[in-house]
Structure formats: C-alpha cells, structure tokens
Design a protein with these regions (language model features):
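Short, basic/aromatic-enriched C-terminal tail that caps enzymatic domains
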Residues: 131-147
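Structural signal for conserved beta-strand scaffold positions within catalytic alpha/beta enzyme cores
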Residues: 24, 46, 135-137
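Cap/insert and terminal regions of metallo-dependent hydrolase folds
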Residues: 33-133
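Acidic, two-metal ion nucleic-acid-processing modules in DNA metabolism proteins
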Residues: 30
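Conserved beta-strand hairpin/beta-sheet module of binuclear metal-dependent hydrolase folds
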Residues: 9-27, 44
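Short, small-residue-biased leader/transition segments that mark boundaries at the very start
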Residues: 1-6
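Short, basic and Ser/Thr-rich N-terminal targeting/leader segments
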Residues: 7-9, 129
Length: 147
C-alpha cells in the first residue's frame, strides 16, 4: 500500500496467508485512515518509531531536514507511532516490533517507553503490558514469533 513518504514509490506492506497477516510500516510521515485500514487486524507488525520530536528539534540536523522529517512526508515520531498503535491493537495481535529508529534522534529505551506510554494512556481498552512490544535491533535478529 502506498505511504506518504517523500521518496519514489514509498510503500508499506501487508502480507496475508490464509487467516494470518503481518505488516511492515516505515517511512510513514503521518498516518491517515487509508494506512490504518491497511494495518488493521494484523497478527504482527513492524512499525516505524523514528524519532523523539524534542531530540530532533534540538539536534544537529539542518533546519530543512528537520522540517522534512517532521512533515507529512517525513518519518513517524515515537508519540505518533504509539497513537497509531492504539488504533491497531486487538486481542489476537502476537507481536509488535518498533523499527527504523534514528541513530541521531532516538534511543531504543526512549522509543519503547514513549510508545508504551501512549498505548497505556491512550483511548483504547489495552495497556502496553498486554502485548509483546519490542525494539527491532539493527545489528542482530529479533525474536522470532509464530503467527
């Protein structure tokens, strides 16, 4: 499914096999109802949690790049990743991986804690502890889950 990223043919993925489905959603910028619809009822999801907004704002990137990252065609912040996740959670979701973290504008622990806080405090019936949420590692294989 197409995303809003500012590159050539940006896409997210939804892979289905029988009754099971997994999704990969990075380079989102902002999300809309179309993206939410493509990511609903997944068994597992790799979701972009690219940056902490404050770290990006005070970081070393030039102004134009900060504006692009924060814009509709940029990257999804930790906070917005958590808010999107609130709309996607359901009782049968088996795994959530946070990915595409910025090396300069994020920390694994910060992404995890921010997303978990958004889920726990968000407008949904779940708490973050109800799900296996983990940060996808850059340099090694993440936990393998069966869907």
């Amino acid at each position: 499914f197409p995303t809003r990223r500012s590159s050539d043919l940006p896409v997210g993925y939804r892979v289905e096999c029988g009754e099971h489905s997994v999704g990969i959603a990075t380079d989102l910028g902002k999300y809309n109802e179309y993206i939410v619809g493509n990511l609903q009822n997944l068994d597992a999801l790799l979701l972009e949690a690219n940056h902490d907004i404050r770290m990006l704002q005070v970081g070393k990137y030039p102004y134009y790049l900060k504006q692009r990252i924060l814009g509709d065609r940029g990257h999804l912040s930790n906070e917005n990743a958590g808010r999107l996740l609130c709309r996607l959670l359901h009782d049968n979701m088996k795994g959530i991986f946070l990915g595409h973290l910025s090396r300069e504008n994020n920390y694994e622990e910060l992404a995890y804690e921010t997303v978990c806080s958004e889920v726990t405090l968000g407008d949904n019936p779940y708490k973050s502890r109800d799900f296996r949420i983990q940060v996808a590692q850059r340099d090694c294989i993440s936990e393998v889950i069966t869907v």
